[in-house]
C-alpha cells in the first residue's frame, strides 16, 4: 500500500499528471482554468501554516500542473548585492492527491539563472539570507551562474479516532552558485527541513494544532583566482561596513547550523465563516568557520523569530471576503571569535581565546491584505485586492557604535478579470493589473568606526541604504490565456505573459523592469 501511494505521488509531482480524478471542484470535463486553480490555492488556509496535519480541513481537490517559465529583470533600482540584469529559466511541477487513507501534496522546481553586473558579493549564494559574516570584493561588476533545486512535500492522514490528524512536511534545497570574475567563488548551499504536526478537533467547529520545525543547513564557499599575476583586494565583513581587508586568493568558508522551532494553530469554522490563527517561534544558530583543513571559528549568529498569522474568510453564494494578516520579529546577535594558532605537534590547530556579541540585527515584517472574489461556477469572475507590506530594519554595530536603520512599506491594489472567450474548449483570458507604491518613512546609515576609507563604508552600505530610503511607484500587467487541449478531457493548457516596472525619481536610481513568459498545463 505504501509503495503504491509513493508511486502515485511521484507521478503526480514529477510528471504533473493526476492519477485520480475529482469532479467536485471542476466543471465537468473542463478541468481547472487558470482562475479556478488560483481560487483553489487561495482557499488553503492550513497550507500557509507550518502544520501539514491540517490538510484535511482545507478540502483541496486533486490537481496537477507542469509549467516552464522564462523571467528577465533589468534596471538599477535594486539592493546593493542584486545584479542589474537577471535571466532565469525554470521548470515547476506541483500536485495534490487525496488517496483516501492519505492526503499528499508535493512540488519540485529547478531554476537556472544567469546574472550580469552583480557587485560586491564574493561569498554567499544568497547574501540576503540573514548571514552578515561573508566576503565581498571591491565592487567590480561580475557575472554569476546559479542552479537551484527545490523539493517539498506534505503527507497527512484524514481524521482518525474521530478527532486526530497527523502530518509531516519536508523540504530539501540545493543551491549552487559560481562567480565568473576574479576573485571567483564556488558556493554550495544545502538545506533540509522537517515539520511534523498534529491536529485535534475540540468540537465540530473548533480545531487546535501543534507542529515542530527542524532545519539543518550548510553552505561552503570557496574563493579562487584564475589570473594569479593579479592580486585583488577582498573584504571580510563583520557588520555594517566594518571589515578586514585582504589581498590574494581569498578564503574558504564553512557555514553550518540548525534551527529549532514550534508552532500552535487554532481554527474556528462554520458554513459561512472560517478563521485560522498561528503563533510560531524558532531559533537558529549558525557557525562560520574559515578553512576546511584546519578550521578556525570566525563567527556565529544566534537568530530568534517570533510571529503570528491570521487568515479570515467569509463565504456567500456569490462572494468570498478574505482578510489576511501576518507579523514576524527577527532578532539576531552577531558573535565574533578571537583565536590563536597552536602549532604544537600534539594539537595543531586554533585555540579560542575570547568571543562576544559585536553586532545586532532586528527585522520587523508585517502584512495586511483584503481580497474580494466574485464567484462563477468553480472559478471566479473577477477578484480585487488591496494590501500593505511593511518592513523595519534596525542594525547596530556595538563598539564603536554604528547603525543602519530603515522603515519601508509597499502598498498595492490588484484587480483580476476572468473573461470567457469560448465555452466548448473552456477558453479563458485572465487579466491581472496591479498598482504598487513603495514608501520609505525613515532611515539612516551612520558609521563611526576608524576605517571610513574602506569601500564597504564609502560606497557599499550607503548604496544599500539609499535604496531602502527611496520612494518608488510602479505597475504590473499580466495576461493568461487557457483552454482545453482536447475536447472531453480535463487537460488545460495555458500561456502567461507578464510585465512590471518599478520607477523611482531619485538621482541614484532609475527603474526596475521584469518580463516573464510561462507555458504550462494543468489537470
PLM features: residue spans?
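Transmembrane beta-strands of outer-membrane beta-barrel pores
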Residues: 68-74, 110-114, 159, 172-176, ...
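Residues on the lipid-exposed face of transmembrane beta-strands in outer-membrane beta-barrel proteins
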Residues: 91-97, 151-157, 194-200, 262-268, ...
Amino acid at each position: 500500500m505504501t509503495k503504491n501511494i509513493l508511486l502515485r505521488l511521484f507521478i503526480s509531482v514529477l510528471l504533473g499528471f493526476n492519477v485520480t480524478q475529482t469532479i467536485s471542484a471542476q466543471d465537468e470535463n473542463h478541468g481547472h482554468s487558470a482562475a479556478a486553480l488560483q481560487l483553489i490555492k487561495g482557499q488553503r488556509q492550513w497550507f500557509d501554516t507550518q502544520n501539514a496535519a491540517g490538510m484535511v480541513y482545507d478540502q483541496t481537490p486533486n490537481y496537477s500542473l507542469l509549467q516552464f517559465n522564462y523571467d528577465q529583470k533589468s534596471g538599477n533600482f535594486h539592493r546593493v548585492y542584486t545584479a542589474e540584469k537577471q535571466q532565469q529559466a525554470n521548470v515547476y511541477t506541483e500536485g495534490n492527491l487525496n488517496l483516501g487513507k492519505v492526503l499528499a501534496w508535493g512540488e519540485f522546481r529547478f531554476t537556472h539563472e544567469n546574472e550580469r553586473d552583480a557587485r560586491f558579493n564574493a561569498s554567499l549564494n544568497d547574501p540576503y539570507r540573514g548571514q552578515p559574516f561573508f566576503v565581498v570584493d571591491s565592487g567590480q561588476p561580475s557575472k554569476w551562474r546559479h542552479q537551484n533545486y527545490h523539493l517539498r512535500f506534505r503527507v497527512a492522514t484524514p481524521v482518525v479516532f474521530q478527532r486526530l490528524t497527523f502530518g509531516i512536511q519536508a523540504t530539501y534545497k540545493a543551491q549552487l552558485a559560481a562567480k565568473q570574475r576574479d576573485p571567483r567563488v564556488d558556493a554550495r548551499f544545502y538545506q533540509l527541513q522537517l515539520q511534523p504536526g498534529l491536529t485535534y478537533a475540540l468540537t465540530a467547529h473548533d480545531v487546535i494544532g501543534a507542529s515542530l520545525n527542524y532545519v539543518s543547513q550548510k553552505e561552503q564557499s570557496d574563493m579562487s583566482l584564475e589570473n594569479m599575476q593579479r592580486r585583488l583586494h577582498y573584504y571580510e565583513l563583520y557588520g555594517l561596513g566594518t571589515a578586514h581587508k585582504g589581498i590574494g586568493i581569498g578564503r574558504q568558508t564553512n557555514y553550518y547550523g540548525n534551527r529549532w522551532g514550534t508552532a500552535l494553530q487554532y481554527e474556528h469554522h462554520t458554513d459561512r465563516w472560517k478563521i485560522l490563527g498561528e503563533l510560531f517561534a524558532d531559533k537558529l544558530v549558525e557557525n562560520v568557520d574559515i578553512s576546511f583543513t584546519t578550521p578556525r571559528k570566525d563567527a556565529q549568529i544566534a537568530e530568534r523569530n517570533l510571529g503570528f498569522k491570521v487568515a479570515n474568510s467569509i463565504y456567500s453564494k456569490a462572494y468570498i471576503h478574505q482578510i489576511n494578516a501576518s507579523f514576524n520579529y527577527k532578532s539576531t546577535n552577531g558573535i565574533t571569535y578571537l583565536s590563536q594558532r597552536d602549532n604544537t605537534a600534539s594539537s595543531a590547530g586554533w585555540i579560542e581565546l575570547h568571543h562576544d556579541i559585536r553586532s545586532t540585527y532586528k527585522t520587523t515584517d508585517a502584512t495586511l491584505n483584503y481580497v474580494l472574489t466574485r464567484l462563477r461556477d468553480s472559478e471566479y469572475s473577477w477578484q480585487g485586492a488591496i494590501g500593505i507590506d511593511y518592513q523595519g530594519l534596525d542594525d547596530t554595530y556595538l563598539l564603536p557604535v554604528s547603525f543602519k536603520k530603515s522603515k519601508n512599506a509597499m502598498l498595492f491594489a490588484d484587480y483580476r478579470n476572468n473573461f470567457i472567450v469560448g465555452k466548448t474548449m473552456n477558453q479563458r483570458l485572465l487579466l491581472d493589473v496591479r498598482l504598487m507604491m513603495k514608501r520609505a518613512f525613515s532611515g539612516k546609515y551612520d558609521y563611526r568606526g576608524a576605517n571610513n576609507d574602506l569601500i564597504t563604508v564609502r560606497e557599499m552600505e550607503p548604496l544599500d541604504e539609499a535604496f531602502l530610503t527611496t520612494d518608488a511607484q510602479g505597475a504590473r500587467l499580466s495576461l493568461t490565456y487557457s483552454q482545453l487541449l482536447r475536447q472531453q478531457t480535463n487537460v488545460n493548457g495555458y500561456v502567461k505573459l507578464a510585465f512590471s516596472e518599478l520607477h523611482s525619481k531619485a538621482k541614484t536610481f532609475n527603474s526596475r523592469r521584469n518580463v516573464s513568459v510561462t507555458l504550462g498545463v494543468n489537470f
